[in-house]
């Protein structure tokens, strides 16, 4: 495989940053373009730490800017598209989520065809497959089952529509006469150092006597460590560029997980943070069916008030369902086609994440000390 180049969208995000860190170590990589919507001093510092012979080009722009995307794609061999509006709680406007996740993805696909980029990898979500009900029990789901989410909520709907567009684009004829090859990686909840979701959980718990509020007691899931999620993207990029492997990858979607034990999200939060004195809230909580119907009531109130007032419920039925369902996946297809094996073991992932949580605890203590002086 000759020298190549890659564009990573969402490069400033939790997953995107880790992909870039791994990508620059790839052999014969000549250039990596990193697309940011906003480029902070922290992002600049992270890029300065990269040790690579490849040229690193920073691009600041919007995923819904067609002209910008066409310029960004010129001369690229591979696109890794991680940029997305992630919102399961319903706080972002529906149109914003659809614009970023659906329109942005389609504009990027169009730019690839125009710029004759031969390979495209999409960071999808297990949410495109479900769960559709908290009453469902889905264990070790496989791609062959072809499950599909029926939710109309903007996040799962938009990711499903975007994935369909990506896979439908496979086989398109590029402007130079070549063929466009695409695939999608369906990711569950991603944990690890720098996770904004875990950071928020920790900071809230620190303000609550180190007690972690329960939100997902009834779930059984298999989250994936960020390093392993990123590694799957690197393997997909290799595979689509390899004439021998590409044939079996083109137009396919893959579940990506690792050896993290199947557990509830609440238990995961506790396991990762217990070394620092955190504990789970032991107080009484609403039964799941009642919580679900309360969410329905709040959604109804929001709908009725919409002509007069923009009321955003604190939770909705989709959020209650996805956080309290039994839904696990198998990554055997990724093993077979991509050669995927987790790079980081559960024990190592747990240790790395716990150590990072320790730095958050220390920062909190330093802040309290400063305020008390």
UniProtKB/Swiss-Prot annotation:
Query: GO CC terms on record?
Result: cytoplasm; endoplasmic reticulum membrane; intracellular membrane-bounded organelle; mitochondrial membrane
Q: What class of enzyme is it?
A: oxidoreductase
Q: Name the chemical reaction catalysed here.
A: a 3beta-hydroxysteroid + NADP(+) = a 3-oxosteroid + NADPH + H(+); 5alpha-androstane-3beta,17beta-diol + NADP(+) = 17beta-hydroxy-5alpha-androstan-3-one + NADPH + H(+); 3beta-hydroxy-5alpha-androstan-17-one + NADP(+) = 5alpha-androstan-3,17-dione + NADPH + H(+)
Gene Ontology biological-process entries: C21-steroid hormone metabolic process; progesterone metabolic process; regulation of steroid biosynthetic process; steroid biosynthetic process
Gene Ontology molecular function: 3-beta-hydroxy-Delta5-steroid dehydrogenase (NAD+) activity; 3-beta-hydroxysteroid 3-dehydrogenase (NADP+) activity; 5-alpha-androstane-3-beta,17-beta-diol dehydrogenase (NADP+) activity; oxidoreductase activity, acting on the CH-OH group of donors, NAD or NADP as acceptor; steroid binding; steroid dehydrogenase activity
Q: Where in the cell is it found?
A: Endoplasmic reticulum membrane; Mitochondrion membrane
As for membrane topology, the entry says:
Single-pass membrane protein
**Pathway noted in the entry:** Steroid metabolism
Q: Where is the active site?
A: 159
- Quote the tissue specificity entry: Expressed predominantly in male liver.
TM stretches of this protein: 288-308
EC number(s) given by UniProt: 1.1.1.270, 1.1.1.210
Per its UniProt entry, which superkingdom is the organism in? Answer: Eukaryota
Output the InterPro entries linked to this UniProt entry.
Answer: 3Beta_OHSteriod_DH/Estase, Lipid_A_modif_metabolic_enz, NAD(P)-bd_dom_sf
In the record, the note on similarity to other proteins reads: Belongs to the 3-beta-HSD family.
Its function, per the record, reads:
Catalyzes the conversion of dihydrotestosterone to its inactive form 5alpha-androstanediol, that does not bind androgen receptor/AR. Also converts androstanedione, a precursor of testosterone and estrone, to epiandrosterone. Does not function as an isomerase.
Q: Indicate what this protein is called per its UniProt record.
A: NADPH-dependent 3-keto-steroid reductase Hsd3b5
């Amino acid at each position: 495989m000759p020298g190549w180049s890659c564009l990573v969208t969402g490069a400033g995000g939790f997953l995107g940053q880790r992909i870039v860190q791994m990508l620059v170590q790839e052999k014969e990589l000549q250039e990596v373009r990193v697309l940011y919507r906003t480029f902070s001093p922290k992002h600049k510092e992270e890029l300065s730490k990269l040790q690579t012979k490849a040229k690193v080009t920073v691009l600041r722009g919007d995923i819904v800017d067609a002209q910008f995307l066409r310029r960004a794609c010129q001369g690229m061999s591979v696109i890794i598209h991680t940029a997305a509006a992630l919102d399961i709680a319903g706080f972002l406007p529906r149109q914003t989520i659809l614009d970023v996740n659906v329109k942005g993805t389609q504009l990027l696909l169009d730019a690839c065809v125009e710029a004759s980029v031969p390979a495209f990898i999409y960071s999808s979500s297990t949410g495109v497959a479900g769960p559709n009900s908290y009453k469902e029990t889905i264990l070790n789901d496989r791609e062959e089952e072809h499950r599909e989410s029926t939710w109309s909520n903007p996040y799962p709907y938009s990711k499903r529509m975007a994935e369909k567009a990506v896979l439908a684009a496979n086989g398109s004829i590029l402007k130079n006469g070549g063929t466009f090859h695409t695939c999608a990686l369906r990711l569950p909840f991603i944990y690890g150092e720098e996770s904004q979701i875990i950071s928020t959980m920790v900071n809230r718990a620190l303000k609550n006597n180190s007690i972690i509020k329960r939100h997902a007691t009834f779930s059984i899931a298999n989250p994936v460590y960020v390093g392993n999620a990123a590694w799957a993207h690197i393997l997909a990029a290799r595979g689509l560029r390899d004439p021998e492997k590409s044939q079996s990858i083109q137009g396919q979607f893959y579940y990506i997980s690792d050896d993290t034990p199947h557990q509830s999200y609440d238990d995961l939060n506790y396991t990762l943070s217990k070394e620092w004195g955190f504990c789970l809230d032991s107080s009484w909580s609403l039964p799941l069916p009642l919580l679900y119907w309360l969410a329905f009531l709040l959604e109804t109130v929001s709908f009725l008030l919409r002509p007069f007032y923009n009321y955003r419920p604190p939770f909705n039925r989709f959020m209650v369902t996805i956080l309290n369902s039994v839904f696990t996946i198998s990554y055997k297809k990724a093993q077979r086609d991509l050669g995927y094996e987790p790079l980081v073991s559960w024990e190592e992932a747990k240790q790395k994440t716990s150590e990072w949580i320790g730095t958050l605890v220390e920062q909190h203590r330093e802040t309290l000390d400063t305020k008390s002086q």
